[in-house]
Amino acid sequence: MTSKIALFDQTLIASLLQPLSLNQPDFKAYKTKVKLKISEQRNETSGEKELKFEISRSDDFEFLFSETLNNEKYQILARDHDLTVDFDAFPKVIIQHLLCKNIVKNLEEDGEVDARKKAGYHSIADPGKPTEINIILDAEKNFCSFELFSKTPISKGKIFSIKLHAVRGDHLISHLLKICSSQAVKLSTFYKSADELASLRQKCGDLEKQVEKLSGVKEEFEEMSEKFKELEDEVELVKEERENIRLLVEDKEDEVADLKQDTESLQKQLEENQEELEIVGNMLREEQGKVDQLQKRNVAHQKEIGKLRAELGTAQRNLEKADQLLKRNSQQQNQQSLDMRKLGELEADLKEKDSMVESLTETIGILRKELENEKLKAAENMDSFEKLSMENENLKEKIAHYRAQRFSPAPSGLPGLQTGLTNRLTPSFKPVLGPHTPYGANLNSRTPFRDNTTLNFQNSTIATPHAFRFNSQLIADETTGSSVTNTPPAQR
């Protein structure tokens, strides 16, 4: 035999049946891993094609069985087991379809490669039919039977069975030497792997330490990043505050300038208001004197009205007496003309007195109205005086407040605010005194009253026709006597 072609070389799961003793037919069965190797070779003498089946175990070095199958032996095998494929197709069929994934295991830890990962003639067709391998050992371990079964959900059937003989002598020694060399290679590989593992463990420890350090550095970096973000936010806030402060300082400077102008104008207004207040006070005192005089005149008129009423009662009584007298003297023919003349005089006198009473009543009503108007004007003057007093007090408080703020120290951090106060809107007043005022030309003229609806000043003293007539009548009565009561000045 010259050359070999390995068609299949994989570790399979098989059921190993071993007799308990030489004399007992019972078997001990257990699952084990066996390595099946199928190779194709040529006979050196005849050149005939042959298939070599070889099984071994990694945990039992003496477990080595093999059998060479040529065309003649295969025909006997096919006839015994009713095989339908020829000798050339036999290895391909059993490799690709019978040795499926259910029994083929990938044992990369043993240095093998799964047949399903190989391409070509000896690759495994996936999925394949479920199969089972049984290996029956001889009691003396001189041969074994390699049986291949197909499985169904309810039964299993034998496909074929090959009798393998134990390998001994030089072939076994060669097999053991191969195992030793492979084990030596594995051992050296293990040593290298152990050294590499130790170095890797050391590196892993170093890496773990570095990872711990890096985790700490990462946490510090995250903390620093958060602090940096916070600082950036604070910087932005500081920038915004600085800009706001700058704008505020500019506004405050403008407000301070306006406040200076307002303070000066308020000072001037305060002085003018004080002068106006003095004038209004004098005016109120004058008006109060006039009211007192009117009240005195009203009392005198009331007394005169009482006298007139008494005279009216006397006249009525005289009229009644005259009526009685007329009734008494109605029968006297000679006295009729005289009585009629007296009666006419009495009636004329009564009409004159009635007209006088009516005129006095009208005069009293007019005087009462004028008195009420004067009272209202006096009340308005008092209200105006109180308002002016309150405005004067408010202006004094504002000026004191402005002076206090003006001479108080400015807040720290705002140097632009040390020159003045905050701007505030102040109510505007119409000037009363001065060259461009209604009373600027003549300060001795009548002081105006302040209107309730507007801030302009108007003279509220208006002479009515009745008051003018009454005053002229009073002046005439003082010199010539009363024309109404026909009494001299001394008797009034």
Curated annotation (Swiss-Prot):
<feature type="domain" description="PISA">
    <location>
        <begin position="46"/>
        <end position="98"/>
    </location>
</feature>
<dbReference type="GO" id="GO:0007099">
    <property type="term" value="P:centriole replication"/>
</dbReference>
<dbReference type="GO" id="GO:0042802">
    <property type="term" value="F:identical protein binding"/>
</dbReference>
<dbReference type="Pfam" id="PF16531">
    <property type="entry name" value="SAS-6_N"/>
</dbReference>
<dbReference type="GO" id="GO:0005813">
    <property type="term" value="C:centrosome"/>
</dbReference>
<keyword id="KW-0131">Cell cycle</keyword>
<dbReference type="InterPro" id="IPR048600">
    <property type="entry name" value="Sas-6_helical"/>
</dbReference>
<dbReference type="GO" id="GO:0051298">
    <property type="term" value="P:centrosome duplication"/>
</dbReference>
<dbReference type="Pfam" id="PF21503">
    <property type="entry name" value="Sas-6_helical"/>
</dbReference>
<dbReference type="InterPro" id="IPR032396">
    <property type="entry name" value="SAS-6_N"/>
</dbReference>
<dbReference type="GO" id="GO:0005814">
    <property type="term" value="C:centriole"/>
</dbReference>
<keyword id="KW-0175">Coiled coil</keyword>
<dbReference type="GO" id="GO:0098534">
    <property type="term" value="P:centriole assembly"/>
</dbReference>
<comment type="subunit">
    <text>Nine homodimers form a cartwheel structure with an internal diameter of 23 nM and radial spokes connecting to the microtubule triplets. Interacts with sas-5.</text>
</comment>
<feature type="coiled-coil region">
    <location>
        <begin position="192"/>
        <end position="407"/>
    </location>
</feature>
<protein>
    <recommendedName>
        <fullName>Spindle assembly abnormal protein 6</fullName>
    </recommendedName>
</protein>
<dbReference type="InterPro" id="IPR038558">
    <property type="entry name" value="SAS-6_N_sf"/>
</dbReference>
<dbReference type="GO" id="GO:0019904">
    <property type="term" value="F:protein domain specific binding"/>
</dbReference>
<dbReference type="GO" id="GO:0008104">
    <property type="term" value="P:protein localization"/>
</dbReference>
<comment type="function">
    <text>Central scaffolding component of the centrioles ensuring their 9-fold symmetry. Required for centrosome biogenesis and duplication.</text>
</comment>
<dbReference type="GO" id="GO:0005737">
    <property type="term" value="C:cytoplasm"/>
</dbReference>
<keyword id="KW-0963">Cytoplasm</keyword>
<keyword id="KW-0206">Cytoskeleton</keyword>
<keyword id="KW-0217">Developmental protein</keyword>
<dbReference type="GO" id="GO:0051726">
    <property type="term" value="P:regulation of cell cycle"/>
</dbReference>
